[in-house]
Amino acid sequence: FYDEDKWPSGFAGGLIPGLGEDFRAKCLARLDLQTAIPEGGRLLKKDSLYQYIQYTAQYGYDIFNGACYADLFNPNAVRKFIESTHQPYFEKYSHKVADNALFIFTDEPHIHARYFDARTKHHGLLSYSPYLEEKFQELYGYSLRDHLGQLYEEKGNWREVRWHYYLAKALLFEESYTRQIADFCDQYGAQLTGHYLGEDDLKKVRDRIGNSALHYRSMQQPGIDHLGLSIAHRLFTPKYMTSVADQYDKPRRLSELFGISGQNVNFQERKWVAGWHAILGVNHFCPHLTAYSLKGARKRDYPPTFSYHQPYWTYNKRMEDYLGRISYAATVGHFDPQALVVSPLESEYVKGDREGEFTSGMVQILEALQNNHIDFNLGDEEVILEKAAVADSQFVIGAMRYRYVILPDMLTIRQSTLSLLLRFHKNGGVLYSMGRLPQYIDAKSDPAALNELKQAVISLRIAEFKAAPEKYIPPGVRITGPHADEVWVQRRKIKEASFYLLYNTSDIAPLSVTLQLPAGSQNPVLWDPAKPGVFQLPVDKNGGVDITLAPAGFYWVTTGKLSEGIPAKPLPQPPGLKPLMTIDAPWQGKRNAPNTLVLDFAEYSTDGGRTYSAPEPVIGIWSRLNDAQYNGDLRLRFSATIRQVPGHCALAMEQPGAFRQISINHTPVRFSGDRYYIDPSIKTRDISGLLREGRNEIELQIPFTACDPLNSDPVKRYETELETIYLTGDFGVFSDQVQTIENTQRNLSEDLVKRPAYAFESFFINREKDRFDGNATLSGYPFYAGGMALSNSFEFPSPDSGKRYFLDLSACEATVIEVIVNDQRADTLCWAPYVVDITKYLKKGTNRLQLNLVNSLRNLLGPHHHKGAELIKVGPDSFTGAGGFPDGRGEPDWYDLRKKKTDLAIWTDTYYQVPFGLLGKAVILSD
C-alpha cells in the first residue's frame, strides 16, 4: 500500500496540517533585525544583527492540495498520520494476507527546511520544531535556543553545537516517524518500506533527513529511490542502505527504480539498471510506476508507465521473470565483505562554509573497491555506536565482520568509533586512511587522541590503491581480463560451496573475463537468468573459468553442493561469426494497431468564435487560461492536412461528453458507446465519411473553468482539462521536413547505446506505403504505438550441415523483436545480444523472414517538444517549457515567449521522435 495522497508522505492529503499549527512543518529562519516577521513566524531570539524566528508553514501549496506539509518531528502528528492511513489499511487487509506479506510504502518523507514565506528575505533556513528543541535539551543538557547563532556563524564551539544539532535532528526524525510507524507495522505483521527524500549525497542526507542509516535500521525492509536512466557515480545510496541491512540482518532490500526514465526505456535498459542494483545487494524491485489511467495529466506523470497501456505489455512477463530470478540470486547465502568504509556523514555536519564536501572523495573509494572486486560495507557512526565490537582482529558490526577498515576524507570522528578502531588495530586489524585524517573528536579538538589514530593508520592515496589494490586488500575473488574493472562481482558465503554474482556494467559492449576459482572447486556451473539456462564451465589448468558477459549481463557461478544434481548443458562457445549476406530493403510492413496522427496544436477563441489565435500548443493554451483564471466559453480549432482520404479514420479524444459541440468540417458529431484508444478515457468516434482532401478542421466548444490548484476539492483542483486529440485509422503520416538528430540528451551519456532522433516540422495524412526501408518512424508511422510486422524474402543456397547460421538484428530499434523464419518462430529478442540462431529454419531457395516488432508509448505520448529530443530523465514539465525537475531552467511564460519567436530553454515547436524498426540491414552470419 502507498501511504499518501501524493508525496511527500506524512500530511495525509492535508488532514494532518488541518489539525492545527502544532502539526504543521516548521523551520528556523535568520532575518535582519529590521525585517518584518511574516505571518506564521514566532521570534525565538535576537542578537546584535539578526533575529531568529520559528516559522510555521502556511496553507497554500498545490503539492499539498492547498494545505502545507506536516511537522514530522512531532510524534503526535505522526501518530495521527498512522491513525488516518496505516490503521484503516491494516484493519481491513491484515487478516487477508500472510505475515510479512503486507507492505506499506512511504515516499520521500523529510524534515527539510523548505517551506517558508516567499516574500520574506532571510539568511538561511534550517530544520526546526519545538520537539527538536526538547530533544536537543534531553540529549545534551543545554538549550539549543541559546546557541542558534552558532548554527549560522563559525564562533565559539560552533562545530560541537552543529554536531549536536544534526545528531538530534536525525535521531528525533527516526524516533518520531520511522520507528513509530515500524512499531505499528509490527503489531499487524506488516512491513514498512519505501524511501526518504535526498539520499543521493551526504549534504542532502544531512539537510533533508538527518541520517538515512537510522531509517534503514528501523524499517522492516529498507529502501531507496533510483531515478533516471543512469548508474554512473551513484554507488553511495544503494551501498549505504544495503550495508545497514547487512549489519542488522535484514534480508530484503527495496529500490523504487526506473522512475522518470521515459516511456521509451526498453527491456535492455531495465536489465542494466536492475543488475546494477542486484550486484550491490538490492533484491526487491518496485517499478515506478503503473498508471491506473492515462486521463489528463497522468500521461505526463513522471513516465514510464508499466501497465497494459504499453504496446509491449504482453511480453513484460519476460522482464519480470528475469527480475525475479536475479532478486532471488541476490538473497542466496550471506554477503561476506572484506572491508568497511567509515561514513564521513558527521564531518558534513560540522564543516564550515569554506570547507569542501565529503561525498565525492568517499565515492571514489567505493568505486575503487567495487571496480577491483573487493566486497565492502559502509559504516555509519551511530550504527557503530549501537552495534559494533572488536573480535580478535575483526571489526564487527552486528551480523558483519571486517578484516580491513578504511577512513575516507574526514573532519571529525566519534570517540566511540575511535576507541573501537584503536582496539581493532591493536588486535592486528588493518586500518587505512585514504584522505585527510580527522581533526576533531566529537567535534572538539583532541590532539593527543588524534595523534594516536595517526600512528595506527596506514595512510594511502586513492591513486596508490588503484595502482596495486591486491597489495593492500586481497579481492574476494580474482577476475582478470582487459575490462575486468567493468565486471562487478559479489561473493556470497555458503557452506561447502562457492557462489558468485557477476554483472557487466556496460550497457554497450559484451565483456570477456576469467574468474579464478578457489583451489579444489568442484563442478563449476554458470547460471544465465536471461536465457534462462544453466551451463557447465570448463576449468583451465590454473583454476580459471572464462566467461563472456552480454551487455548489462547478470550471471552467477556456483560450485560444490550448489551445483550438485543440476542438469547443466555444455557451455556454448561463442563462434567466430562472419557476415555471409544481408537482407536488403524494401520491407513490407503490417501494423497490428491503428496508425495515429497526434494533434497537439490548436487555434482558440474566447469570444464566441469571432476571432481565433494562431495555432498554439494545447498544453500552452491550458496554462495561459489557468494563469489568467479565465472562466467562460472556449473554442478550439484543430486542423489536419489530408492528401488522400483514408478508408477508415476515427477521432480519439478525452471527455467528449464535457464538450458542448464537436464538429468535423462544420458537421456536428456525437460520441457513443465504449470504444476507446489506448486508455478507456480516450474515446473514439468513426469520422471516415466526414473527411476531405486538403485542410480538415475539428472544432470543439467547451465551458472552460480554470483550476484552483490550492483547493482541497480534487474536482476544483483540476477542473477543465485540455488535452491532445488524435486521428487514428488506416493511413500513413508523413512530413515534407525531417532531419536526423544525433545531439540528443540520451547521446550525451557515455553509458548508453547511441541512436538518432528525428525532427519533424509538420505532418499530413496520405496512403500507407506498400514497402519501405524498415524504419517505421520515417515511413508513415512517426506517432505509432503498437506492433509492426516487417516481412521480406531472400534467396539462400543449400545450407552447409557443418555450419551454423545466425541473424544479426543489432540495427533494429524495438522494445521486443519476434523472429519468424519460414513461418516458424526462431526466438523473441528482448535484450542484447540481438542475434538469433536460425540454422534449423533455413532452407535452400526462397526463405521468408518476418520480424514482429513492438515499441512503446514514447512516440505517441512524447515528450515531443523538448530540445533534448530523446531524454533520459522525464517529468511533467518536460512536456512544457516551464522548466523544473528534472529539466532545470525554463520560462514560466514559455507559451507567450514562443509566440515572439524567443529561443526558449526547453520548448520547441519541432516534433522529436525516436526510431522504430530497422536503422540498417539485417545480416546473416555464419561460423
Place the predicted regions along the sequence by residue.
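Extended, low-complexity, turn-rich repeat/linker tracts enriched in Gly/Pro/Ser/Thr and Asp/Glu
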Residues: 655-662, 811-818
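Acidic/aromatic-lined carbohydrate-recognition and catalytic surfaces
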Residues: 1-79, 83, 94-95
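Residue patterns forming the tRNA-binding/recognition surfaces of aminoacyl-tRNA synthetases
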Residues: 78-86, 90, 279, 320
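Short, well-structured beta-strand segments enriched in hydrophobic/aromatic residues
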Residues: 554, 649-651, 688-706, 805, ...
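A beta-strand/beta-hairpin structural motif
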Residues: 830-833
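Glycine/proline-rich low-complexity spacer/linker segments in large multi-domain proteins
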Residues: 563-580, 703-738, 855-924
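Carbohydrate-binding surfaces of carbohydrate-active enzymes
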Residues: 1-7, 13-14, 92-103, 108-650, ...
